[in-house]
UniProtKB/Swiss-Prot annotation:
The lineage of its organism: Archaea, Methanobacteriati, Methanobacteriota, Stenosarchaea group, Methanomicrobia. Keywords: Cytoplasm, Ribonucleoprotein, RNA-binding, Signal recognition particle. One of its GO terms (molecular function) is 7S RNA binding. Signal peptide: none annotated. PANTHER family: SIGNAL RECOGNITION PARTICLE 19 KD PROTEIN (PTHR17453), SIGNAL RECOGNITION PARTICLE 19 KDA PROTEIN (PTHR17453:SF0). Its main location: cytoplasm. It is found in: Cytoplasm. Involved in targeting and insertion of nascent membrane proteins into the cytoplasmic membrane. Binds directly to 7S RNA and mediates binding of the 54 kDa subunit of the SRP. It comes from Methanococcoides burtonii (strain DSM 6242 / NBRC 107633 / OCM 468 / ACE-M). This is Signal recognition particle 19 kDa protein. The gene is srp19. It holds the Pfam family SRP19. GO terms for biological process: SRP-dependent cotranslational protein targeting to membrane, signal sequence recognition. Part of the signal recognition particle protein translocation system, which is composed of SRP and FtsY. Archaeal SRP consists of a 7S RNA molecule of 300 nucleotides and two protein subunits: SRP54 and SRP19. One of its GO terms (cellular component) is signal recognition particle.
Length: 95
């Protein structure tokens, strides 16, 4: 069970190949190709969001894939946090 004051961010939330119905929460322009859990963690650390990694968790819509998730501080809206994480990952990838 997640802690109060934390947001759950799944790699699926930032994945460009997913639809909104499939779990993406930011625009396709802002989203990423195949985001990895370690990239999400590194970006959240860089943004000082105090990430807690839960690598064994499975995204409910794709229960057969073990994608993992991170819990980050709930300082602002989830979509804003997701956009910042995606932007940081894009910069780290060199794009």
């Amino acid at each position: 069970m997640r802690e109060k004051g934390k947001l759950v961010i799944w790699p699926a939330n930032l994945d460009k190949s997913r639809s909104r119905k499939g779990g993406r929460i930011i625009s396709r322009k802002s989203s990423l190709e195949a985001p990895l859990l370690r990239e999400l963690t590194a970006a959240a650390e860089k943004l000082n969001l105090n990430p807690e990694v839960e690598a064994d968790k499975k995204y409910p819509r794709t229960w057969w894939e073990s994608s993992g998730r991170i819990l980050v501080d709930n300082n602002e809206a989830k979509t804003m946090v997701a956009r910042k994480i995606a932007k940081t990952i894009k910069e780290a990838r060199g794009g």
